[in-house]
Amino acid sequence: MPELVELSEHGEVCVVRLRREEKLNALSAEVEGALAEALRDTRLTGSRCVVFTGSERAFSAGADVNEFADLDPAAIAAYYRATGAVYESVADLPQPTIAAISGYCLGGGLELALACDLRVADSTAVFGFPEVGLGILPSSGGTLRVVRIAGPARAKELVLLGERFGAAEARELGLVTEAVAEGEALPRALELGARLAELPALALTTAKQAIDAMPDSSREAGLLLERFAYALLAQTADAEDAVERFGERSGR
């Protein structure tokens, strides 16, 4: 049986590729299990940046609803809880994460992409939340994340109407970091990943975690967190080396 999730190393960047192309990378329970296993792989845990991608036709067309035909509501709810846990694990990875998106990125596929820190989409990308039309709603973190990124009004438009949209509109909404030409999503993601891999790992992780915590923080708590994190990082060898290099360049 072919791998449903394939890992490859590109320098210090780990690429996680969904490999269920014949089903447009639909997220079956098996795929979700393979993705959870990939997140524990040492090739990923030892990397400096992780890129998630699919195929030319689809990043992922979303949950495999055909699996739900023989499931009762409790079993379907359990599936979405498990899927949500996988996506939270993606969001909680200490290193930066990038989604490289071509083709369909719908439902659970879009939820997976939104769990990443950055998203690069090419001109073939098609986004959408079709869940309400199926009698459900995005329930693996997508509703939360689209509100945080696009705001409640646009989130209601996207989720309630379920209309599809392309990379340019996704960029305007903030759902995509960069919109690129056809076939350039993965190369650009790898380029960004290589840049991130050169930066101090602890500073990247701390900045990522601080930013993630800000929406749930009061002004006072957010400022305190920021200053506390700065004080810790300022004592690291990375920070000391950077200050020394700056002094050498400026002749101080």
Region annotations inferred by a language model:
Residues 88-202, 232:
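Crotonase-fold acyl-CoA enzyme core
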Residues 1-55, 88:
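Conserved CoA-thioester-binding segment of acyl-CoA-metabolizing enzymes
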Residues 1-14, 162-168, 187, 191-252:
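C-terminal alpha-helix plus adjacent terminal tail
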